[in-house]
């Protein structure tokens, strides 16, 4: 075997590893995310395979065979726009952010090059050089998938049950039986792809999709035959080997059109049956993910298939068989049951679709949709701030929290939808927010050229190839899916998407532009190969560092949970040493140092975390606390407290700490303190400390009536708050106003709280509650307690006006509405009751009582 042949084999092994091992290998107790190993494998494997391809091309006397693609110019333009936008951010944004801009830009830029660009180019190059044959030993593929899948059934009983320390990675990874199954699988996959054609690798992807889908379906119905415990990180949604249901769903959206196209064009009955079974398995797993954006993407992909004249002709010629398959698929969807591993919310396929009706309601919110509205609005703000070049390539996650904070300060509607978004959940806004109109223009030009070429080539030989047609439709489906999803920004779904896009361009390109040999001097070709090899080497070493960093971080995380701070510190320091900087690992290390009272080290680690990603409010808050309480750097502390509150006004601690800091020097910071506290009591109306601090600030401004009202509210919420009582009593002496009425009943309010806390619902307690409610008619708490006690006694009619008054005075608490709804229900006022339970859920979506009562009301009688 020549060196050239050897490199061809290396390339094939690497591509097999990416297609087969990449989607299927995962560890549940080794790294924070089970798909970390998948990321490392693909982000190293693809560049190495590209380098192996470059070696074979560099040694061809005829020159490099570079695919001539109609999308090359817009793709290069997009890369330039991405780089220019990042450079603009680095030079223009505050210097404080530069380390984080560098870190996030490098991380996302490397993904763009090593996964997206490299996969697309490698796939298109191989497809353009392919012989175009599509025959495969389908029986061999079927036998391989079934036998290899069955081998995993024995893992639960045959696996080694050794346990190791959190940092004993070999023990956590190694299992003799598992290794045996993987070796069998890898050699089987390599054997079946020995011809190295596009069709072989696509069938390998279909095989991996079938295995992952079958496992996901078993998970959904609580039949995990691999692990001895239930994997349920997403509330009953199937994750399979992907670690996230949205990744599996997009993977299947890419593959299902290929399976359907092969089914339609296959003549042999047994082979058609095989593709039909594959299609239905992929569909079942797609349903089990409960990912509606992917369901929509799949429908759009099937519509794209219908644009093929050949497939339409085949459908007309054998409409009965196609009807049976589509009928089976539709019936499965309509009858799809709830997951058996979900412990609470467990919708069916129909249930997930009917939830969309909540969007049309004038009142209330539907979090899955309105959270996206929040993200989209924030993405728009980011892009519109710098319309030409956007906020910076790869910097969405870094800057998103700051723009989201602006929205949260302004609109209480979005408060329970706050998130730390990695991406925008819409590819158009994703590109615009980061690279502006220039980048978006290049992005749209790329896909316009892509699909215009598909339309043109479909009239020729490519339009007769079911693999090519299916791959093109799969690209349509995944793009549609990612108008509401983020999956193509993660390694495995991104890899299959860009691989299929490359297949479409390279295989279709044989209809038009032929590969043009690059006959540069040998020295220049050697230099080009050296550049690709250097890129691949850096990618591989970078992924070794990435994997080690993640493994050591998770070991440290587990040691923290074991209360072994010394071991946690050592593990997290190892994580930092491997690098590159990672915000969560460095933040955890800072917390360990702080708990060990090594405050200088804690502050340094928190600063390093901000240098990795400066978008986390908790890091600013912890750093400010260390500066303020332990290092005596109060001026620095103030700046970081202010940023923490700007990013996240929904933190209970941030406004409390910031306002307390301001009120140390009211002559200097009184107005900022009032701004913070007025917003704090709006956002946390039941927090007595915020009301007490607001009262103090208002008293400093001599706004006596408002100060009295704030102190009174604090005592109404927490009668035991002695500081508020003393402040309110002192207010009367300072202002010359009469004593606040609540001071006369505060003792009785404390006694009532104590009685209710002790579950003393006696006549004496009821009488005390009635007395307090009469004396403080504007106290929502007093009216609520009295009404609730009346309700518990069966005096429903008497309870209603008390609870109505409580709800009128306190509009932000769910408890009053739940009890009022229960009272209405007892009186037969079903529609009024349903309205109150629905209102309670708008205020507190997780309120179990309201959920159960509303469900009972809507159940058929």
Language model regions located:
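Alpha-helical transmembrane segments of multi-pass inner-membrane proteins
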Residues: 2-28, 43-55, 76-87, 108-236, ...
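Interfacial juxtamembrane loops and adjacent helix segments
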Residues: 93-99, 164-166, 219, 224-239, ...
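Hydrophobic alpha-helical transmembrane segments in integral membrane proteins
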Residues: 336-351, 524-563
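Helix-start (N-cap) detector for alpha-helical repeat units in TPR-like alpha-solenoids
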Residues: 548-552, 583-584, 617-618, 652-653, ...
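Residue-level recognition of tetratricopeptide repeat
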Residues: 557, 591, 625-626, 660, ...
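Structural signature of tandem alpha-helical TPR/SEL1-like repeats
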Residues: 563-570, 596-608, 629-643, 664-679, ...
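Structural marker of alpha-solenoid helical repeat scaffolds
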Residues: 578, 612, 647, 683-684, ...
